[in-house]
C-alpha cells in the first residue's frame, strides 16, 4: 500500500523484453539492503516486487498482465519513473491510498499550461470512466491527484509546480 506522494524518481538503465514478460532495472538514490529483495515498490503507480539489488540498481519482473494494463510496455532506457516505498504502519498519509493494482491507462487529450501549473485532460474508455468521481482521487504515474472535472469521455486533473518538479509528470 502506498499514498501517491512522490519524493524520488529512478531512471531505467536496462529493459529485457519478450512477448510474455519484461525485466527492468532502475537506478535510484533510494538506499536498499539485500534483505529488501521481495519487498514492494510503487513504480509509476504499479506495485512491483524488487527481485535484485546491486548498489543503487534495483530490478523488477513485469508479467504479461502488468505490461497489458500499465505504461511499462512502452518504457525505454533513460525514462524516468516515479518511485515510492510502501507505507509503514503509523506513518503520515498525505495523498490517498494507492494499491498499485492498475486497471488501465488513459490518453492525454490536451495539456493547458497556466503560469507554472498544468491542467491535463485525459481520454478514458466508458468502462473505466464510470469508476471516476469528480473531486475524487486518482493515481497518474503513481502520483495522488484530484479529479477536477469529468465530461463525456474525458477527465481533468490539475498539477501544481511542486508536483511537476518532484515527479515525471513534467515529461508527459
Task: List the predicted regions and their residue ranges.
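Conserved loop->alpha-helix
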Residues: 1-172
Amino acid at each position: 500500500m502506498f499514498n501517491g506522494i512522490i519524493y524520488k524518481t529512478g531512471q531505467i538503465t536496462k529493459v529485457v523484453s519478450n512477448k510474455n514478460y519484461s525485466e527492468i532495472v532502475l537506478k535510484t538514490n533510494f538506499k536498499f539492503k539485500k534483505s529488501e529483495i521481495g519487498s514492494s515498490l510503487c513504480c509509476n503507480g504499479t506495485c512491483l516486487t524488487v527481485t535484485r539489488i546491486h548498489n543503487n540498481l534495483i530490478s523488477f519482473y513485469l508479467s504479461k498482465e502488468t505490461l497489458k494494463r500499465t505504461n511499462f510496455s512502452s518504457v525505454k532506457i533513460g525514462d524516468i519513473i516515479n518511485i515510492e516505498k510502501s507505507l509503514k504502519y503509523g506513518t503520515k498519509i498525505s495523498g490517498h491510498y494507492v494499491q498499485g493494482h492498475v486497471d488501465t491507462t488513459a490518453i492525454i487529450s490536451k495539456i493547458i499550461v497556466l503560469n507554472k501549473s498544468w491542467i491535463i485532460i485525459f481520454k478514458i474508455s466508458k468502462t473505466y470512466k464510470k469508476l471516476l468521481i469528480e473531486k475524487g482521487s486518482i493515481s497518474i504515474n503513481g502520483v495522488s491527484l484530484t479529479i477536477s472535472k469529468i465530461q463525456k469521455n474525458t477527465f481533468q486533473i490539475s498539477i501544481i509546480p511542486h508536483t511537476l518538479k518532484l515527479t515525471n509528470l513534467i515529461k508527459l
